[in-house]
Amino acid sequence: MARIDCFNPIAGRISNLPDGEIFVISDFSDLADDAAIRKVLSRLEGDGKIRRIMRGVYDRPIYNDFLGEYVEPHPDKIAHAIARNFGWTIVPCGDTALNMLGLSTQVPSVWLYVSDGNYRKYQCGNITIEFKHTANREISKISSKTALIIQAIKALGKEKITDEVINKIKAATTVDERKRMFTEAKYATSWIYDKIKEICGGAK
């Protein structure tokens, strides 16, 4: 598609996105080449239609009338947009996994993810997002919920998986998710799978 023809298709696609949605260059690669996409996004940013969060990452910002300012994008949404741009599979790990699973109320100082891509670290205002490479078997071919729970269990450590933790994880999962996890987590480290079997209650 010629560059002169790509503005309306890109702008139209963005206008159909919900407020707060984050998007990246690759989301429009079927409409134009990267250079043309960047020009369109730069023009839309200049017109105040979109917000540039960081290089190559944009959103349709949500305005909070009460605060009189735009709402900051959620770090997890930024992380997944970056991953989508590179074609990575990512899963929250460490304190990030604990926070997202409701096992910790502490907001992570660094939003940390395991990834099947290269190691990368990004600074977005006051937000630090870090991707660590890991073995594919820990994150591929399993559901995002199973992968998240494996990482949360690993972050806590064997001795800190109490009955309270097990019950909290149960409460954060559906019956179908536990059935899937019982099957998907078979190749996790043995002690982690033992804890997952407790969570799943021997689901089959």
Where are these regions (language model features)?
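A short, charged helix-loop
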Residues: 123-133
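Short gly/ser-rich loop at a beta-strand->alpha-helix junction or flexible surface loop bordering the NTP-binding
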Residues: 53-56, 83-125
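Positively charged, aromatic-accented nucleic-acid-binding surfaces
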Residues: 81-82, 93-95, 155-160
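Short beta-edge/loop segments at beta->alpha junctions of small alpha/beta modules
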Residues: 2-81
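Hydrophobic alpha-helical interaction segments
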Residues: 133-204
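N-terminal intrinsically disordered, low-complexity, charged/polar
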Residues: 1-3, 203-204
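Amphipathic alpha-helical interface surfaces
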Residues: 37, 93-94, 145
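Alpha-helix N-cap/loop-to-helix boundary motif
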Residues: 71-74, 82-89, 141
